[in-house]
From Swiss-Prot:
Organism: Histophilus somni (strain 129Pt) (Haemophilus somnus)
Family designation: Belongs to the UMP kinase family.
Enzyme class: transferase
Main location: cytoplasm
Purpose: Catalyzes the reversible phosphorylation of UMP to UDP.
UniProt-listed Gene3D superfamilies: Acetylglutamate kinase-like
Protein name stated in the entry: Uridylate kinase
Amino acid sequence: MSQPIYKRILLKLSGEALQGDEGFGIDPSILDRMALEIKGLLGLGVEVGVVLGGGNLFRGAKLAKAGMNRVVGDHMGMLATVMNGLAMRDALHRANVNAKLMSAFQLNGICDTYNWSEAIKMLCEKRVVIFSAGTGSPFFTTDSAACLRGIEIEADVVLKATKVDGVYDCDPVKNPNAVLYHKLSYAEVIEKELQVMDLAAFTLARDHNMPIRVFNMSKTGALRNVILGKTEGTLICD
């Protein structure tokens, strides 16, 4: 059997990835499939941290444009990621996977408050750790949270799960002739103005030499292929 090329990963799942074709909320079948794919990684000996977005439930930035205070909107968005985290933890438990949900701010009785040393300890015990509530501060995206937590837990890579096969030279949804990149440097991403993630998140990863791999989570087996070093998605590193 092939061996994994990563020992510890940070998996970033967008809220949109959880909603499937529903357009809103959480598709239980997708949640269960993701839980089983994560379980498969544990079987390979990989330690898994997860950061979830909240865009399937709430988008603070969008309402801020309509007049809502941005801080209030972002706080609501953080709570949406906690809701997704609760759903993911439940799906993992139903798949007989030991998982812990942590929040960047206190939510006593619902989940644990984020603690770096405790997170490391649980990862070493082969428990899946779900990091919710973003960074705990407004004005930062969940991509920033993913890169931050990935750096903190000393992950080998941040895996950004999307609905497309990787990073393209233009929008593949609008242009069927878009070209998929298999490997890019941080400098190339900035030079070509490719939309991998927001600049704050991307520069954080770059400054700490944290590799990023963008791949299509909707493809069954894609996550496992990434872990086994097969050609899947786009790798961004120096």
